[in-house]
Amino acid sequence: QHETNHETELITLRRARKYRRSHFSFSFVRNPFDRLIAAYNNKVIENEEPPQPMQNMGVTHGMSFEDFLDVLIETPYKQYDVHVLPQSQLLCIGNQIVPKFVGRVEQINEHWAELRDILARQGVEVMESLPQKNVRRRDRGGLQDYFNSDALIEKTLQIYGDDVRLFYNDVSVDHL
């Protein structure tokens, strides 16, 4: 069970799978490269002290991005802080995606409209559009500063390869 800062209840995947027949579940995933950079910048660079779960992993304030990746590679997923845990670990049992609908943050308006249509057919009304929160990067420029070698891309794929394969299989890694 991973912490969500007491903002939401994060149920286990097995419990979610039990609800799958009687409930409609959905999730939005984020480009794993963007998500990784956001976690690194916020938790390692901006915060004076990384969250305790990250400290337990060996993450320290101001460590280099490559050292951060090495810590992630060396740490078993069960010890990950939720901010860096691969989304496939949160949303899948094996390679089975538990939510019935998975949209992408990068296409949130389009995918939200699609989800709204699905929910409307089931008699569920939801807001017309979603509020913009925690928007940090609107262009692709910021990623190249971090992923400036094939080795760093490979290390990232070693951790988040399942996320790319399951949720971004129609997008070239060069375009993530």
Residues covered by each model-derived region:
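Membrane-interface amphipathic segments in extracytoplasmic regions
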Residues: 1-176
